[in-house]
Amino acid sequence: MSRKKRAPKKIPIVDYKFKSNVLPKLINSIMYDGKKTVAEKIVYDALDKLKTKGKEEPINIFNEAINNIKPTVEVRSRRVGGATYQVPVEVKSNRSQALALRWLIDASRKRKDKKMSDKIFNEIYDAYQNKGSAIKKKEDTHKMAESNKAFAHFRW
């Protein structure tokens, strides 16, 4: 057993505009080369577009979209006796949130729109309506876990 102390959990940063602790994680994930103001502008432009399109508050639409993308199970590789099995495992809440943000950004970057704010806006709105590439990624992950349910007893 390790003699070192566990690192204390970091206090989540709260967004100054929408009072959300998920939004700064999205902004930091979008950021390239330390240009945080550019990333903030992209995200806030996308949320402003959500305000004009949606009937709810944009932060509520964003949170609902993230909840729709969050996976509940995933597969992990487990080597048993020379064979590698894809074992379905439940996903912890902080990992599911991180995966949802990652899938949202990846799906946004693959879109064909001109501006990144348009890409993120469209992907968030699609996820809010249970459509889009990020939702498809979640469904593929769940299908993979479902098809490998027989190996669930290899869980660790």
Q: Which residues make up each language-model segment?
A:
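Strongly charged
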Residues: 2-33, 37, 44-156
